[in-house]
Amino acid sequence: MKAIICKKFAPVSDLVWEEVADPIAGPGEIVVDVKAAGLNYPDNLIVRGLYQFQPERPFSPGHEGSGVVSSVGADVKMHSVGDSVAFFKGFGAFAEKIVVSERMAFPIPKSFPHKIA
């Protein structure tokens, strides 16, 4: 899969689009095929190293998004493959897929546009 990657704290123009390993859901986690991701002011600060939270590099920015569940880990009870969800995570939404806790994903109607969710 591909993701936008921050390799060093720098302007957003230094972000790169590159191949990374597909995420694998662990217990209580789901993998979401990302259809839309929100861009927030903190994302701009984080990639420049100006935010109080600074993840280890390299990382994919993006706090939130929506998509379709493509796999579930052991003990997942709240979501199933094929569910449309909105999700929140500290970073990682600027990718084709993301793994999130099932508790941080919320069902949305399949008829609801992902870019609005």
Positions of predicted regions on the chain:
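Cytochrome P450 core scaffold surrounding the K-helix E-X-X-R motif
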Residues: 42-48
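Short hydrophobic "strand-cap" motifs at the C-terminus of beta-strands
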Residues: 6
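A local structural motif
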Residues: 12-19
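Structured surface patches comprising rigid loops and adjacent beta-strands/short helices at the edges
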Residues: 99-107
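A glycine-rich, Thr/Ser-enriched phosphate-binding loop motif common to dinucleotide/cofactor-binding enzymes
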Residues: 112-117
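Glycine-rich beta-strand-centered segment in the early N-terminal region that forms part
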Residues: 21-38, 50-92, 99, 111
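Extreme N-terminal starter segment of soluble prokaryotic enzymes
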Residues: 1-2
